[in-house]
Amino acid sequence: MRLDQVGVVPERTDDPQEVLRLVRRDGAAILTGLGRDPEDGRQVAKDVFGDKLLAVPPAAVVNEGGDKDRRPMGLSYRTRSNCHSDGYAYGDKYPDYIILLCNKHSEEGGESFLVDGYKMLEVMAEDPELGWIPPALATVPINQTESGMQPSTSTIVKTSPNGRKMLLMANEIDQRPHDDSTDPDRDQEMLVKWRETIYEATDHIPHFKLYPGEAYIVDNYRLFHGREAYADIGRNMWRVWVWTQDCAFGLPDGLLHSDSRNARLKAS
């Protein structure tokens, strides 16, 4: 397979409108010349998306200590953070864009990587052994509910009401065959091969680094993101989840934040 073809290295620019053009073309871009505070991250969303914004909640810190995120078992600054989508704690109403603003980088490690989900579907469709998976991803509903969060039973590949294709990438705990599946073994095989192929691609694509005052803007419906292990425990980023008028199913109910703190199911 042509796994070296599925990576995206965002172009850099200091022009927010150029960022919007690049994101629409490539799925991602890097905006330079920024401040390094959480409000600077939110301002990026306002400058790039303008009146297309529906919501730009407070930024969440991304560092070794974390904040309100549920961390996958075994993940630390010493391990790779595998490719994933952000915000699926909100179910199918996950944010359509994400922003990651660098406050402090690690000199050693911490490189980011992006896998183009649209391109991955094309590459897998051409493979004799994996060609069955892309159609299955678009037709087989699975359980995509993060533990304790908003429920989601849907396909990994969806087309939104406005025609936008949306993909979701999660770990083996949060994406699993549905209890009512007619063929759970085949559904599990679909999920494993999808996940393993994306993880394998990470070793074949170029990586890049964010430096202080730079932010990447990523189409969260199209690209999956991750980062390598790093040495400096003081590495610090600000993450902003963004909902625009082009999001698939509108805003989640209630207060929003750029992490899962407000997505938990309310006790009955």
Regions found by a protein language model. Give the residues of each.
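Active-site environment of non-heme Fe oxygenases that use a 2-His-1-carboxylate facial triad
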Residues: 2-13, 24, 61-268
